[in-house]
Amino acid sequence: VLGWIIGEVLGIDPLGIKVVTGDTDLTPVDLGSYSSRVTLMTGNAAMQAAERARELLAKGVGEKLGIPAGRLVFADSRVFDAEEPKLGMTFQEAVVCTEARFGTIGTVGSYTPPTSPAKFRGGGVGPSPSYSYSATVVEVEVDPLTGIYRVPKIWMAHDIGRALNAAVAMGQIEGGVYMGLGEAMMEEQVYRDRTHKGNRIFVHRIPSMLEYKQPTGLEMPEIVTYVVEDPDKNGPFGAKEVGQGPLLPIMPAVANAIFDAVGVRVDENPVSFEKVFAALQSKADGKEARFGPSNGPDGVPKVDFGDSLKIKTPWQGGDGTAWNEPKREKKAAK
């Protein structure tokens, strides 16, 4: 994706661009590529660096050909006059003449997310100017006697902003479906609870990757993919992430589809056949038709999170302040 962004700015074939792994010898310390931030954040930085290189090249070519730099077009691996397209040179020639005029061409780009306008406690955590959205429909077939089920078909729609490479984007979306299906159906690490020298420790019940199941071609369903393009002004050429987003709705969709089919809830991942069978047995015995952690002392503890904060949007006249945030006492410095 970074190569495609740079290629689009400079008007050259992305296959001729080499993207190397950066390190702190060449670049400043970066927070990382987690949370599907490469296309948006690194993409914006790459675009800025490419635009600076294009500006320098335009100046060099403009002086060489006697053409105003603002009239030059970068396309089809050439740099040419917008008014007289035949007047120009190849991109390689543009690099040579610019280096002869200004020396080695080296430009940098950076990107910092905009500061969050939120003034309430925790409002500045993990700011991002844009987010992707996904929606999915999962079809399941469940055996009401055994709890064994299969997923024959999944429909997945993902708002990508703009697809910089449609084929790769669809592959990413379907890869997210694959990952989500693995988490929903079978991926699990089972531990033994042991005490050693007074310390409570956990060890794998079956320490083998053979027992960490993932979907194969036999388990993968038919996937109908919808790439929803709504360009985002904050992304490079309007693009947003297409990495982790598509996997998120798969797990709740599988659980909801099973409930719709046989009327039982499984409230923990993976939604294995054994858990569905246990929930079916509980339902048949007249008990709660569910399987999952209880709300008792050994289950999920109840946590009082308090009232939700209420923040008016800018168009409602808000300034980022939560009008119902509890006041915090200031402690005197010692």
Please state what every model-predicted region is.
Residues 4-334:
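C-terminal catalytic domains of large/alpha subunits in multi-subunit enzymes
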Residues 1:
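Flexible, small-/acidic-enriched active-site or ligand-binding loops
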